[in-house]
C-alpha cells in the first residue's frame, strides 16, 4: 500500500492512515513496532527545548495510536555551555499501561548508542 498526499489526501491524513495500518498490523502479527518520527520546529521558539508530544510533526495520529512515546533530548545540541555533554534524556511522554518519566543515559554519537549511566551518576 502506498501513502501519498494529494489534493484530496493531505500529508497529515496519509500519516494518520499509515499509523492506523501499523497498529492493525502489530495486532494481527502480535508484534511490537517502533516508529520514528520527525519533530516540528515549534520547540525552536521555546526557551526549554525538551520535546513534547505536541511537537510530533504532522503525526498526531501516530501519537494517538501509540502505546508508548519516547522523546529524546540532548542539552548539548541547544546549549554550547552544557554540563551534560554526552548525556541524553529519554522522555517517556506517553505510557498507556504505566507511569511516564525521564531517564538520563550516556549517548555515544559516533555510533548512535545509548547506555546506562554509572551508578554514581544517578544521584546527580
Where are these regions (language model features)?
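C-terminal regions of RecA-like/P-loop NTPase motor modules
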Residues: 6-12, 20-30, 41-124
